[in-house]
């Protein structure tokens, strides 16, 4: 049976608590671990009269298991794991070292005094649906015709995933050369490692950038991939690594090195890239563009509807990927802010971001520090993080799943406050 579980912790070493729970779940009789999400931070659910000391943020994740255990046996096992990891029975909203909730048990609907499945809160809680949408976006839970991703988008509360940008290039538009010192990140750059995703690119796609061959690109990204593998060694709950490349050779080598996502700004124009992805289990970012590198003189007609163009383009390219055997749940669509759009068109796409959700694919925006902001600020790209944060807040409010940004720590600090005050 395929089982979905939600994990949460807001006491002690929260990430370690969840990792120990996952390891214990994987060790249950007749059980194997299939997929698990990255970590999302959320505010504690509290009653109005809860003590102030209960107000501790949670870390959350989702897990997919295959198990031969019966539902009540699995419930008993999860409760034993909670107890072993220090969970103390107390009042409903009190902090806890670990929560392990059985969200779905195959396609069964279960209602007993001990267990209700699907879990009663699964359809209304962002901290449950956001991690689930990362690993099983197209899954339909019993009792609903909507996918997990569609359910997530129906609730007002949003919980975006953060993607940190790692440009291992000497000429990127806002941070070129920052990661080249000793092939390792500086202390300040380590903040980029605290998100859900890390996107590593070895070729600049800024206007006027010069193409690089795959060997040069690989020499740039390989040391960072190796560093990250060592940095996260032994950790289950680690960011997923994305390789930002349009080279099939680089993509194949990165997949072999263990990346989880291939982010191709060319929109998988090279058939060889599609064949490589079809033979892998990686997710992929499908980005709209008119030219790579970006060309400010090559933009959509000023009198067109940019969303209509995007909907048509994504529809065609998703069909190409599906014919190649790539399931839609693996695809993340990116409208390509800065690639073939004027500033006005980019802002319109941001404002109408929800229209991109008709494809039932996760949506990513790479909007950080880009030229569309020039009409609102005169600072250089490397200083546009406050402006980027404002755009990120609006995209998150519109339900966009993944936000690709440079100043990850600034965004996370902002988001913690924004969640509490918006």
For every predicted segment, state its role.
Residues 1-44:
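N-terminal beta1-alpha1 ligand-phosphate binding loop
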Residues 45, 49-59, 72-158:
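Flexible, gly/pro- and Lys/Arg-enriched active-site loops
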Residues 162-164, 191-202:
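N-terminal glycine-rich anion-binding loops that anchor highly charged ligand groups
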Residues 35-66, 202-212, 293:
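Short, charge-patterned binding micro-sites
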Residues 170-187, 205-230, 234, 240, ...:
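Active-site-adjacent loop and "lid" segments of alpha/beta metabolic enzymes
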Residues 239, 328-330:
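Short acidic capping loops at alpha-helix termini that bridge into adjacent secondary structure
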Residues 9, 63-69, 104-107:
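Short beta-strand-to-loop capping motifs
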């Amino acid at each position: 049976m395929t089982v979905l579980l939600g994990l949460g912790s807001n006491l002690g070493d929260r990430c370690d608590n969840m990792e120990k729970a996952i390891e214990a779940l994987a060790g249950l009789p007749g059980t194997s671990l299939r997929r698990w999400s990255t970590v999302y931070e959320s505010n504690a659910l509290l009653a109005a009269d809860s003590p102030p000391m209960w107000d501790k943020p949670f870390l959350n994740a989702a897990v997919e298991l295959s198990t031969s255990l019966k539902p009540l046996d699995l419930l008993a096992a999860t409760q034993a794991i909670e107890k072993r990891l220090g969970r103390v029975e107390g009042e409903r909203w009190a902090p806890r070292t670990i929560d392990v909730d059985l969200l779905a048990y195959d396609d069964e609907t279960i209602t007993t005094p001990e267990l209700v499945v699907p879990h009663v809160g699964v359809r209304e809680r962002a901290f449950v649906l956001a991690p689930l949408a990362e690993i099983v976006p197209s899954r339909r839970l019993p009792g609903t015709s909507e996918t997990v991703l569609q359910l997530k988008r129906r609730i007002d509360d949003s919980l975006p995933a953060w993607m940190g940008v790692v440009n291992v290039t000497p000429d990127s538009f806002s941070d070129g050369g920052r990661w080249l010192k000793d092939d390792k990140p500086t202390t300040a750059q380590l903040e980029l490692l605290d998100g859900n995703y890390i996107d590593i690119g070895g070729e600049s796609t800024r206007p006027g950038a010069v193409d690089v061959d795959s060997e040069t690109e690989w020499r740039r990204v390989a040391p960072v991939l190796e560093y990250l593998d060592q940095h996260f060694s032994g950790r289950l709950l680690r960011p997923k690594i994305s390789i930002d490349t349009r080279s099939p050779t680089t993509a194949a080598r990165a997949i072999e090195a263990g990346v989880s996502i291939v982010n191709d700004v060319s929109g998988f124009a090279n058939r060889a890239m599609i064949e490589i992805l079809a033979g892998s289990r990686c997710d992929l970012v499908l980005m709209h563009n008119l030219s790579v590198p970006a060309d400010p003189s090559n933009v959509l007609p000023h009198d067109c509807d940019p969303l209509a163009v995007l909907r048509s383009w994504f529809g065609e390219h998703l069909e190409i990927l599906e014919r190649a055997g790539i399931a839609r749940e693996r695809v993340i669509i990116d409208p390509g802010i800065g690639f073939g759009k004027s500033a006005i068109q980019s802002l319109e796409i941001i404002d109408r971001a929800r229209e991109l959700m008709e494809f039932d694919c996760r949506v990513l925006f790479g909007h950080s520090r880009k030229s569309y902001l020039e009409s609102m600020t005169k600072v250089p790209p490397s200083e546009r993080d406050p402006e980027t944060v404002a755009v990120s807040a609006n995209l998150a409010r519109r339900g966009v799943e993944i936000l690709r940004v440079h100043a990850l720590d600034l965004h996370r600090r902002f988001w913690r406050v924004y969640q509490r005050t918006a």
